[in-house]
Amino acid sequence: MDATPGQYDFAPAAPLFPLPNIVLFPRAVVALHIFESRYQAMMAHALAHDSLIAMALLLPGWEKDYYGHPPIDPVVCVGAILNHEHLPDGRYNLLLQGRVRAHVVGERAGHPFRIAQLTPAPESIPEESDLANERTHLREIFRHGQWRNTEIARHLDKCLGGTISTPDAADLIAFNLLDDIPLKQSLLAEPDVRRRIQRIIAAVTEIHLPTPRRSNWPPKTSSN
């Protein structure tokens, strides 16, 4: 769930991989299966350059123009390919880890896939010491009540007990625990980091788990 933290140079452009059911967050890792020829070309392009792909959410009505230029939410998460498997028939399996939020401000033509022109998404980030209450609240969620003793809660509590920042931990929690896609996209786009964390806390608190809860960890592979 949690890779080594780092600061990344912002890429002003990246291939776009739009899907209707995935919202990637920084630090989160998603398993993907690439089978469409245009996205096989996207993978080859990414691997030949900086191994970056911008995950975008398709907007309602995308079905009408899926093979053309369907509408996307302009807030995306740029991810880096951690590893990949190129299958004999041209398909790919890969793990993509989110790095940064970005805004799509334009697109470049000339490829069978879409390439986004990007600018950094603005964020107001408090000092870590100012988020102590939010971090404590997050840890309490996974140590008490319905989440206690679940496998994913143990992973997340261990994560919160380490050196990961509270905003990064909250992003991981949102990616792994929330199912509401519009809510997740709204959280990805939320520029006020404290408010984002508080909204994630509220959303996770409102989840009602079945008894017993079937583990959703590790996450399943998603296909294009």
Model-derived regions, located:
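N-terminal low-complexity, acidic/polar interaction/targeting segments
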Residues: 1-224
